[in-house]
Amino acid sequence: MPELPEVEVVRRGLHHHLVGKTIASTLVYHERAVRRQSGGAVELAGLLAGQQISGTGRRGKYLWLTLEGSSGAQALVVHLGMSGQMLIGPISRPQHLRIAATLDDGSVLSFVDQRTFGGWMVTDLVTVDGSELPEPVAHIARDPLDELFEIGAVVTRLRGKHTEIKRALLDQTVVSGVGNIYADEALWQARVHGRRLTDGMSRAKLTEVLDSAAAVMRLALAQGGTSFDDLYVNVNGESGYFDRSLEAYGREGEPCRRCGRAMRREAFMNRSSYFCPSCQRLVEPR
């Protein structure tokens, strides 16, 4: 699933291509892509018609287009799911086209989604913590790249929880945007085992983990995100290349680039965690 860097790459591309343009018409080719819209395809198309795209936003892994029309400020919320793509111009996989919106200049915004876990929904904006957010996103916490992210408050909350640090990093109500890949990368950078309990960690170490998450995601963002296959691409259909720079994720059996020990993998919440058994010991050495 695309994580913060990948979604932010898409948001930036959409902002560049779409802001100031008006949606002329929308065609829905697969009902699952609009399952979150109460009135389905007809309602979505009606709500989008004539709306001008005035901006873009992102909170964690959710992104949206801000709309200005006769109904006032609304948002087109996009969830990419496991394989969703927002593409401008010609598409290479028309068999996976789920939604197409034609703009007033004749260009087309396509939502392509092979696995159909993602989708579009038009919703109202609400004010939360001084920020205007789509209603379905209102419960999502700020992410480490948000300029208003309060790291001290997040550390306090983490220390008040009796939970594993990796589990906490994946809790989108505590800190958003961090998924399995970047959690493993941040924990490797901070030399912390993912099963360490947050209430037993110092404020300094928790701060280091969150700082590492932010640093890793900035690096990934600069490289266009992480693409293991062609399911994640930017709005021009191009893949990111941060997978070449991963230090932990997917490196089972390979030498740790810090100490040389073989990296390990263990099961975690129906996924996998990758870590160095030497640099990331579960029990601190005496």
UniProtKB/Swiss-Prot annotation:
One of its GO terms (biological process) is base-excision repair. CDD domains: EcFpg-like_N. Binds 1 zinc ion per subunit. DNA binds at residues 96, 115, 161. InterPro entries: DNA_glyclase/AP_lyase_DNA-bd, DNA_glyclase_Znf_dom_DNA_BS, Formamido-pyr_DNA_Glyclase, FPG_cat, MutM-like_N-ter, Ribosomal_uS13-like_H2TH, Znf_DNA_glyclase/AP_lyase, Znf_FPG/IleRS. Keywords: DNA damage, DNA repair, DNA-binding, Glycosidase, Hydrolase, Lyase, Metal-binding, Multifunctional enzyme, Zinc, Zinc-finger. PROSITE patterns: FPG_CAT, ZF_FPG_1, ZF_FPG_2. Its EC number is 3.2.2.23, 4.2.99.18. A zinc finger (FPG-type) spans 247-281. GO terms for molecular function: 8-oxo-7,8-dihydroguanine DNA N-glycosylase activity; class I DNA-(apurinic or apyrimidinic site) endonuclease activity; damaged DNA binding; zinc ion binding. It catalyses: Hydrolysis of DNA containing ring-opened 7-methylguanine residues, releasing 2,6-diamino-4-hydroxy-5-(N-methyl)formamidopyrimidine; 2'-deoxyribonucleotide-(2'-deoxyribose 5'-phosphate)-2'-deoxyribonucleotide-DNA = a 3'-end 2'-deoxyribonucleotide-(2,3-dehydro-2,3-deoxyribose 5'-phosphate)-DNA + a 5'-end 5'-phospho-2'-deoxyribonucleoside-DNA + H(+). The active site is at 2 (schiff-base intermediate with dna), 3 (proton donor), 61 (proton donor), 271 (proton donor). Its cofactor is Zn(2+). Belongs to the FPG family. Involved in base excision repair of DNA damaged by oxidation or by mutagenic agents. Acts as a DNA glycosylase that recognizes and removes damaged bases. Has a preference for oxidized purines, such as 7,8-dihydro-8-oxoguanine (8-oxoG). Has AP (apurinic/apyrimidinic) lyase activity and introduces nicks in the DNA strand. Cleaves the DNA backbone by beta-delta elimination to generate a single-strand break at the site of the removed base with both 3'- and 5'-phosphates. Monomer. This is Formamidopyrimidine-DNA glycosylase. It comes from Mycobacteroides abscessus (strain ATCC 19977 / DSM 44196 / CCUG 20993 / CIP 104536 / JCM 13569 / NCTC 13031 / TMC 1543 / L948).
